[in-house]
């Protein structure tokens, strides 16, 4: 079995070395090494706190002020954490530096690809980005730290400063449609490559 795995890795290395255009798909696994838990694994956020999934469901989030308050408090607990890109992110950066990386299609919302130095324009975050908050009504976007500071200052369910609408992280929740422009860009990156 080890021999087969080694042969497979050798073949992958040859493919990557020869490729002119590479698009990479990433998910939670690349960021767990940076200390960001996944959702469903043994130490996942929803495994440890099944009620947290309610905050990730659009109808519950929009319809229940207590769900929103709890979600904002959970985000505040993360404000001082400073996850850093890991070897996986840096390996992708090396592909970019060699001119091979055409795109990253990711389910991750942590922004670690960009923080590693990868060009933001080639990172297609299909589930959004946790570093922004967005008004559900008027689409106004603000840095997440600005919104979290309001929570820290005593506003348990901050509302949009422009229209009074409900604020949420700029991430995709269950029952929420993916952003068509992001999906289109992800498809283009997946089609315009030698290796996916």
Give short role names for the model-derived ranges.
Residues 1-196:
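Conserved catalytic core of sirtuin-type NAD+-dependent deacylases
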């Amino acid at each position: 079995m080890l021999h087969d795995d080694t042969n497979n890795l050798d073949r992958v290395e040859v493919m990557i070395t020869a490729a002119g255009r590479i698009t990479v798909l990433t998910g939670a696994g690349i960021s767990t090494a940076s200390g960001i838990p996944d959702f469903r694994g043994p130490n996942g956020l929803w495994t440890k706190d099944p009620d947290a999934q309610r905050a990730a469901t659009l109808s519950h989030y929009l319809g229940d002020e207590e769900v929103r308050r709890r979600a904002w408090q959970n985000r505040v607990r993360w404000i001082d954490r400073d996850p850093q890109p890991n070897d996986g992110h840096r390996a992708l950066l090396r592909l970019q530096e060699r001119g091979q990386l055409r795109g990253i299609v990711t389910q991750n919302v942590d922004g670690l690809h960009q923080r590693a130095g990868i060009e933001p324009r080639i990172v297609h975050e299909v589930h959004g980005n946790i570093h922004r908050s967005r008004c559900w009504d008027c689409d106004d976007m603000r840095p997440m730290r600005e919104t979290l500071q309001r929570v820290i200052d005593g506003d348990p369910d901050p509302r949009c400063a422009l229209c009074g609408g409900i604020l949420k992280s700029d991430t995709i929740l269950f029952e929420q449609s993916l952003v068509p422009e992001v999906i289109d860009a992800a498809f283009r990156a997946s089609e315009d490559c030698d290796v996916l």
